[in-house]
Amino acid sequence: MGDITVVLGIGAAVLLISVIAVRVSIRLGLPSLLLYLGIGVLLGESVFGIKFDDADLTQSLGIAALVLILTEGGLTTRWHAVKTSLWLGVALSTVAVAVSVAVTGTALHFLLGLDWRMALLWGAVLSSTDAAAVFSVLRSLGVGARLTGALELESGLNDAPVYIAVVLLASADKISWTAPLLVLYELAAGALIGVLLGVFGAAALRRAALPATGLYPLATVAVCVIAYTAGDLVHASGFLAVYVAALALGNARLPHRADTLSFAEGLGWLAQIGLFVLLGLYASPSRLLDALVPALIAGVVLTFVARPLSVVLASLPFKVPWREQAFLSWSGLRGAVPIVFALIPLIQGVEGARDLVDAVFVLVIVLTAVQGSTLPFLARRLGLVNLHEAQEVQVDSSPLDELGAELLQVHIQRGSKLHGVYMTELRLPSGATVSLVVRSGKSFTPQPTTRLQVDDQLLIVTTEEARDAAERRIRAVDRAGRYARWKGETGD
């Protein structure tokens, strides 16, 4: 009992300090991920004396945390916000990765004297942008759906090809001519598994009459984790499978969707905190100083040569303006993922892999501090920040099983064209009606002359048959205003 009490006490204290660190990081203008790493380093052998050097366990826990982070990222990504950036995001996560690996690897082969295998391993590991870092920074900037969508898709999708590249390079003596076919199979099969489990999982959850609201978020996350394991079992990309499944589930008509997203967000934060503290605990400060020079050389090549060149080449077919290209080039945020991937060659006994781990750790600290703290400034200087960008209306549903009906909860956001619309202008389908409006903490039954306002919350009772049409109509008016056509403007 004594040991578990100490472990629980230390774990809870670290978690509480990490939560407080979020507030501190905002005040200091630094990414909170750096503070989590710092907490882990302080807990380590050099300060508080906790010795932890198990690379296998670190990698296993790191992959588990990454699965949860990708789950949260996929669930909270709105399809309509990223669909216009889909192919740009795919290009950044494939073409840009290949260019970055080639350019970085070639440069480090000559600059650091690394053999080709190790040089390309450096390039592959450093090419992965971190989903946790990107999600935590971008969503508060207000740089527009196109850029945010492209970067979120890139960070969610590029783990798969990078992981495959690292595994292949770490076992370079086993690579055959079938390697490109293997890569294509892993990506295609991973995406297919994600789509199938996401679609069928959403259908099952809609039909499940679970006895408690809190079970829906648990079931949703479980489906996403199953997608990862299913992909891994058939030697497909589990990372791609979990992200695609989460994306499909997050954009499906799920019961208690708001509760699910809140749960996923909390789980994502827990995974981020645990992962970065763990990696900080694993790091050896005495070795990091020796890795400083090669890490900085790699950082300069990656930041000022490989990343910009890869962005330019990947975005050529999409006619991306130079300002957006500059922002995309500076937004390749690194975090825990490169460190976790760097452990793969170390575990497989590749010569020089320990130096790679140390250099990547240093580079993550430097790039996160520099890029993460300057990204808001750069976005403003490039004129990409839109302070008045409209936010999507929030619609949640709760099943009313005994009545054969559902309750839609609608929250009118800033910039929504629902503002100023009269109740009669909503023109909801037959079987749906606004039963209550909550405004400034007070609720009332709306009249035909009631005019909607920003921050109003509407409770709409609808039959199961009219539910989809009611939500489409609400989203249509949210986007196009009172004159949104019943047919043609769906809001999707």
Residue positions per predicted region:
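C-terminal end-of-chain micro-motif
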Residues: 1, 453, 490-492
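Transmembrane helical cores of multi-pass secondary ion antiporters/exchangers
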Residues: 1-388, 392, 401-402
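Sequence-level motif detector for i,i+2 pairs with an aromatic at +2
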Residues: 38, 405-407, 432
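Short, glycine/charged-rich beta-strand-loop motifs at protein surfaces that mediate ligand recognition
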Residues: 300, 408-413
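Short, solvent-exposed amphipathic alpha-helical segments in soluble enzyme
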Residues: 346, 383, 426-428, 451-453, ...
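Long, charged amphipathic helices and adjacent flexible linkers at domain junctions
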Residues: 387-410, 479-492
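Cytosolic Rossmann-like ligand/nucleotide-binding regulatory domains
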Residues: 414, 418-465, 470
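Surface-exposed interaction regions enriched in Ser/Thr/Asp/Glu
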Residues: 463-464, 468-483
